Design a protein with these regions (language model features):
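N-terminal hydrophobic targeting/anchoring segments and the immediately downstream early-domain regions
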Residues: 2-208, 253-382
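Short, glycine/acidic-enriched loop or turn micro-motifs at the edges of active sites
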Residues: 68-70, 224-227, 248, 313
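Glycine-enriched alpha-helix->loop->beta-strand junction motifs that scaffold or abut catalytic
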Residues: 100-101, 186-188, 212-218, 236-242, ...
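Loop-centered beta-sheet repeat module
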Residues: 199-234, 240-244
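Glycoside hydrolase catalytic-domain context in secreted enzymes
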Residues: 216, 223-226, 246, 276-277, ...
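Aromatic-anchored, glycine/proline-accented short structural segments
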Residues: 225-269
Length: 382
């Protein structure tokens, strides 16, 4: 029987931060927020027009975009050049710069129906494609795996590319494959659509996957996961979790949107809800998107809301937010609604930085007390 490591994690309270390194991780989160508050210096003139203020704020605190479907979109193009501009997609370097995007999570999700070895192989191909795209666009893009690397990329005038989320099927029911994908740069994994993370919630193997993700520094993405999976993940995970493309279910009942109770629980656990700019999930106008951001901020808190362009996934976007260049319009709308500059900087950059730093801290602490898990799904789930 493979050893089931850190079984004690399953009894941790969401907001109690109990456990062998939960207290330290929570202290690190609080320190991150304190550092951000202490270091914050306004960069815009409150007497100027909102759009002008938006550009000024974003020039210093760019957007960390939680979800881009660009890798899959590029697979179907015979040729592309993202540095000079690519009309066939919603995202290229000129538009990212115009929209003040400083970091971008590139989705490795696959079409439905791929599982087992086929899913693992297709994910490896996606990783290879992303690395090739970044390597061939050195003036605009740079791979990043940590908060520090993302900041370094921005300081060098590059847009940080973070790998993930990948679908849960990508690991092929193997923690060894999970570790291999991490070694190749994967930093976010979606916990849904597999037997160990289903409508019924996380199985024993699913919980062990999440613990191993914590040990490595792979963030859990809970967008599209069942309510039972979300709740259990908030209990088991020692790192903050992400919802890379979830808005408010109370405003728009899309299956990937979160109900109010889960938004509150996510905020209590210092997770991050990244609101997508898609008409299906948030509505047809920039005002609708701002309504969702207001709602999420009110329930989860300003430290638990982020942005997710969700461009290049084949879906319609709200008016005035058609592509990656349009973020200043959204920020101007929020400023017009009374959002403070401090809250805007958390929304665009600070919250993602906090989550990445916390995941790294948790991983380093976990690696001091546990070896790589040898658990097998057949042994834990039968």
């Amino acid at each position: 029987m493979a050893d089931l490591q850190d079984e004690v994690h399953t009894t941790t309270d969401v907001d109690g931060a109990a456990g062998p390194f939960g207290d330290e991780a929570c202290r690190a989160d609080r320190a991150d927020l304190a550092d951000l508050a202490e270091a914050f210096v306004p960069v815009s003139d409150p007497d100027t027009e909102p759009l002008e203020r938006a550009h000024a704020i974003l020039a210093t605190h760019p957007v960390a975009d939680g979800y881009s479907g660009l890798p899959w979109a590029l697979r179907h193009l015979p040729w592309f050049d993202l540095e000079t501009g690519e009309a066939a997609v919603d995202t290229d370097v000129p538009r990212l710069r115009e929209g003040h995007v400083g970091a971008l999570f590139w989705s490795l999700h696959l079409p439905k129906g791929l599982d087992g070895d086929r899913a693992v192989g297709a994910t490896l191909e996606q990783l290879d494609l992303v690395r090739t795209v970044v390597r061939t666009h050195p003036e605009g893009l740079r791979l990043a795996c940590t908060a520090g690397q993302a900041t370094d990329a921005r300081r060098c005038g590059r847009i940080a590319v973070l790998l993930g989320p990948a679908g849960a099927a990508a690991i092929g029911e193997s923690l060894g494959v999970l570790r291999s994908l991490f070694a190749l740069g994967l930093r976010v994994l979606t916990l849904s659509g597999v037997s160990w993370a289903s409508e019924a919630g996380l199985t024993r193997f699913g919980e062990e996957v999440l613990r191993e993700m914590n040990r490595l520094g792979v963030l859990a993405d809970l967008s599209g996961a069942s309510g039972e999976t979300v709740r259990r993940a908030l209990v088991v995970s020692k790192s903050p979790v992400l919802c890379t493309r979830s808005a408010a279910h109370a405003l728009r009942p899309h299956p990937a949107n979160l109900p109010d109770d889960l938004l509150a629980e996510l905020g209590a656990a210092k997770g991050l809800c990244m609101v997508p700019l898609t008409a299906k999930q948030t509505g047809p106008t920039v005002h609708d998107v701002a309504d969702h951001l207001d709602h999420v901020r009110a329930l989860a808190g300003p430290e638990s809301v982020g942005l997710s362009g969700t461009y290049d996934v084949g879906t319609a976007h709200p008016r005035e937010l058609a592509d990656a260049s349009c973020y200043p319009r959204l920020i101007a709308e929020l400023l017009g609604r009374g959002w403070t500059e401090a809250d805007i900087t958390l929304l665009t950059w600070g919250n993602v930085q906090r989550v990445l730093r916390s995941a790294d801290f948790t991983a380093r602490a976990a690696q001091q007390r546990r070896e790589p898990s040898t658990a097998k799904i057949a042994e834990l789930d039968g």
